[in-house]
Each structure stands twice: as C-alpha cells, then as structure tokens.
Amino acid sequence: MVKIRLARFGSKHNPHYPHYRIVVTDARRKRDGKYIEKIGYYDPRKTTPDWLKVDVERARYWLSVGAQPTDTARRLLRQAGVFRQEAREGA
C-alpha cells in the first residue's frame, strides 16, 4: 500500500527544530527511509511565510491512484487546499 506521510529531516545537532517532507512512500518503509516522491514541505514552528508547501497537482494524482494519507498528512493536505476542488466538482 502506498502512503502519503511525513518524513523528518533537518539538523541532527538541534533535535528541537524538526522539519518534515511530505512524501509518497510504501507503507512498509521506515519513517525517514526511501520514498517514491516528495510532494511537499512542512515547518511546524512556522518560522517562515512558506511554512507549508504542497504540490497540489501531484498530491491529487497520488490520491486518485489510491495513496492513503496519514491523519497528520491529511490535515496538512486539507489546509493546502488539495481537497477543495474535488468537493466542488462532486457537488
């Protein structure tokens, strides 16, 4: 099964300042392991204006082929507007 989830990265010397990539990966892989595609970026400390970036087109593609987002990834994708157009098209 393919998942959309967060992969932690950033400085090893400062564990209190994590950053995350929003990635598409096989569900059996490690959290920070090899991934199929990077579709976004998330900074939980919101230190920059672009603290959340998502390639909406690619996210919609992966969702259309059956990728399952984790709860946190789903919340971030919703915040980025990935689900907005789909809801309007279906109505």
Swiss-Prot record:
HAMAP family: Ribosomal_bS16. GO terms for cellular component: cytoplasm; small ribosomal subunit. NCBIfam families: S16. Pfam families: Ribosomal_S16. PANTHER family: 30S RIBOSOMAL PROTEIN S16, SMALL RIBOSOMAL SUBUNIT PROTEIN BS16M. It comes from Thermus thermophilus. GO terms for molecular function: rRNA binding; structural constituent of ribosome. This is Small ribosomal subunit protein bS16. Binds to the lower part of the body of the 30S subunit, where it stabilizes two of its domains.
